[in-house]
Amino acid sequence: MRIGKVKESILKRSVLRQLHNHSEQGSPASGEDAGVLFMLEFMPEFTQGFSEKNGVAMAVNPVEGWTFAAKRAVYGAVNSMLAAGAAPKAISLSILMPEEAEEKQLKALIKEIDSLCMQENILVLSGHTAVSPYVSTLILSVTAMGSITENRKDITANKENNTANKGSIADSKGNTKQITVVNADLDLVVAGTVGREGAAMLAAEYAKRLEERYAPSYIEAAKHLFDDGSMTAVADILQEKEVVSVHDVREGGIFAALWEMAAAANVGLSIDLKNIPIKQHTIEVCEYFNLNPYMLRSGGTLLLACANGARIVEQLKNAGVEAAVIGQTTAGNDRLIRYDDEARFLEPPKMDEYYKVN
């Protein structure tokens, strides 16, 4: 396709006509400068601006490359909203493609995004689609929007005394309300299996190489590790009173997510490596490429800090999500990963293991 914004004919044929989830809340259109989301239908409190108990959550998630791009875009948007304690409502897309990209690739991408958005009951609100000489593969930037209530989860701690039991946020009138934050002696729960996003991508991109060691049927199964990457089914569980904080596990894997949560809350960690849920397919793919599966992108996985992890794990399993208590938060700053009688310190996030394969 030509460099610059895609032709109007391509935009209409391969983008707008592939989007079917329109409503009075908003819909994308050619020539419009912005998408408009009418909040009154699903957030009546917006009639007078932000209310004391509700607001809007927004997040931006980048997706690089064509492999499972639609799933990574939509599931990433949905899970980032759920982790923030928000109900996902809409996404906006910025799509940049290399010059050699074909219209059929764009059409297939939008068609799958539309299908997933309908499945998740969210809108594609607006977007920008262009071909750029500065990119060598698909670059998809997804802005997610959700409605949020006073029950939102927060991980910010009092960094002065490391005891933060409560924090506060200001409403539209400048008043404050209390929110629970992460402190020591909480259970850490992983919902979903770690490394599955990265393992599925590697299985799809390097199937021929993997066939040197594994059966084609085994590799095919690995490609589907990320098929159930949405956590919408457990949204209500994430709002249970025992759940203090939720963190979306993505680039850098579970080790990065653990560090980010602990650093934000100024707490220590004690993690049992053997308790972290992981699929054998993920382990095998990582062994072939000599990768650390705990540092591999893990879209479709959430990290929870809970007051009663065992109860939350039981609920997650009853909802069909693999889950486990993997450790606890501790006082101080020691962040330890334990394996049997050995222990080592967790290090700050490094480059995702996915990028090591070429």
Regions found by a protein language model. Give the residues of each.
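Acidic, Ser/Thr/Pro-rich beta/coil linker or hinge segments at domain junctions
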Residues: 2-3, 7, 317-358
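General beta-strand structural signal in soluble alpha/beta enzymes
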Residues: 26-29, 57-59, 123-127, 189-192, ...
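Glycine-rich anion-binding loops of enzyme active sites
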Residues: 38-45, 58, 62, 87-159, ...
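Small-aliphatic-rich amphipathic alpha-helix that forms the alpha element of a beta-alpha
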Residues: 66-91, 108-119, 233-237, 256-260
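Helix N-cap motif at beta-to-alpha junctions
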Residues: 305-311
